Amino acid sequence: TEMIINIHYKSEIIKNYIRDKFPEKNIILSYEKKLLDTAGGVKNASKHISNDFALVLNSDVFWSKMNFKEILNSIQSLHKDTKCKLFLIESKNAYGIDKVNGDFSIKNGKLERYNYNFPKLYYSGAQIISLNFLKSYKKNIFSFNLIWDDLIKKNMLEGEIIKSKWYHVGDYKGLNIVKDLD
């Protein structure tokens, strides 16, 4: 298993922390001299990945063992034609997030951008991306939103709802919610 962490802001602090806390782990740090945005950063890091697919995780989420169990089960059933599969959270299982609108909805079995007529789903910060598909984008600085919108237009963006609780920790409110969890 390869673990790659994109770094830019405070990269020396992160590099030293990883080196000191996880010396026995094979963690590759992929430095972005210039910010490449979400998809561009993963595309840049993909040179370190030998697999066809990458599991991409955002760092502002507290990942529980149950979250990972659900994601790993989904990886086992992944089909080779998958371009991108998002892991989504229903609002009833989302903690530490105050968004009025969701990120996505499922309409007639298809994933689309949030539609207030359907239950709101949040992007969990986890996705599986085909690296060959990602590399087909000629840009080097670009967001996953571009990929998602392209795939939505083609009815090819996949999504799976994670049933376990999910904790967003991108601000102090979210951090305070999870500080006492095991």
PLM segments and residue spans:
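Conserved N-terminal catalytic core of the sugar/cofactor nucleotidyltransferase
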Residues: 1-58, 136-139
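Structural beta-sheet core signal
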Residues: 5, 56, 84-87, 159
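Conserved beta-strand termini and adjacent loop/short-helix elements that scaffold enzyme active sites
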Residues: 8, 30-32, 87-89, 114, ...
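Short beta-strand-to-loop element that shapes/binds the nucleotide-sugar donor at the catalytic cleft/hinge
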Residues: 9, 85-103
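Short, hinge-like loop/turn segments at secondary-structure boundaries
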Residues: 20-24, 46-48, 73-74, 101-107, ...
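Short, high-confidence coil segments that cap the C-terminus of an alpha-helix
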Residues: 51, 80-83
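Catalytic-core segments of class I nucleotidyltransferases/pyrophosphorylases
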Residues: 55-57, 62, 68-78, 92-96, ...
